[in-house]
UniProtKB/Swiss-Prot annotation:
GO term, biological process aspect, one: dUMP biosynthetic process
EC number: 3.5.4.30
Xref: InterPro entries: dCTP_deaminase (IPR011962), dUTPase-like_sf (IPR036157), dUTPase_trimeric (IPR033704)
Source taxonomy: Archaea, Methanobacteriati, Methanobacteriota, Methanomada group, Methanobacteria
PANTHER family: DCTP DEAMINASE
Nucleotide-binding in keyword set: yes
Reaction(s) the record says it catalyses: dCTP + 2 H2O = dUMP + NH4(+) + diphosphate
Keywords for this protein: Hydrolase, Nucleotide metabolism, Nucleotide-binding
Oligomeric form and interacting partners: Homotrimer.
Function: Bifunctional enzyme that catalyzes both the deamination of dCTP to dUTP and the hydrolysis of dUTP to dUMP without releasing the toxic dUTP intermediate.
Site (Important for bifunctional activity): 120-121
Stated name of the protein: dCTP deaminase, dUMP-forming
SUPFAM superfamilies hit by this protein: dUTPase-like
Length: 197
């Protein structure tokens, strides 16, 4: 596998192999081996409710814990210890022979903010806005502004195209085409759905 350079990223975009929409400021967003992505304006945060735990087997459970916030003007404030979901402002589409990784920008990390908890890997064939799993591990609240550059995407070539890329009918591609922050769809995992646990 090889990481795409800035010149390769530009070529892939020009040839329609990678979609990044909108890419409003390519000169600022395209870095030597990545593309800076911005945060969208919709956030999902946990409500405080009285339940002992989140149960992945209860399909109504997970959504009931989340509250949606739309931010048009001004910041979304994330407090120490809080967790929120958001998406990138940009819609991303990958071909069947390219994977991507999302990493938080160093400037954001130095404020105590992580941009993804575990889901930094993007499968070949994915298209949609990338979910950001944001948490504040610092000691101060931090303001995040819609369309602020918060993360970067790195592209890597594969040795051959995927036989069953993300979105293939035979795959459980639960988040294909997402345009808004999506809560966990763990209830759709095979072992949960078929009561294998």
């Amino acid at each position: 596998m090889a990481i795409l350079s800035d010149r390769d990223i530009k070529r892939y975009i020009e040839e329609g192999l990678i979609t990044i929409d909108p890419l409003d400021d390519p000169e600022r967003q395209i870095q030597p081996s990545s593309v800076d992505l911005r945060i969208g304006n919709e956030f999902k945060g946990f409500r405080v409710i009285r339940k002992p735990c989140i149960d992945p087997k209860d399909p109504s459970d997970i959504e009931s814990y989340m509250e949606t916030f739309h931010v048009e003007d001004g910041p979304f404030i994330i407090h120490p210890g809080e967790f929120a979901l958001a998406t990138t402002h940009e819609y991303i589409a990958l071909p069947e022979d390219l994977v991507a990784r999302v990493e938080g920008r160093s400037s954001i990390g130095r404020l105590g903010i992580t941009m993804h908890v575990t889901a930094g890997y993007i499968d070949p064939g994915f298209h949609g806005r990338i979910t950001l799993e944001i948490s504040n591990i610092g000691k101060m609240p931090v303001a995040l502004y819609p369309r602020q550059r918060v993360c970067q995407i790195v592209f890597e070539t594969m040795t051959s195209p995927a036989e069953r890329p993300y979105g293939h009918p035979s795959r459980d591609s639960k988040y294909i085409g997402q345009t808004r922050p999506q809560t966990s769809r763990i209830k759709d995992d095979y072992e949960i759905r078929n009561s294998r646990l």
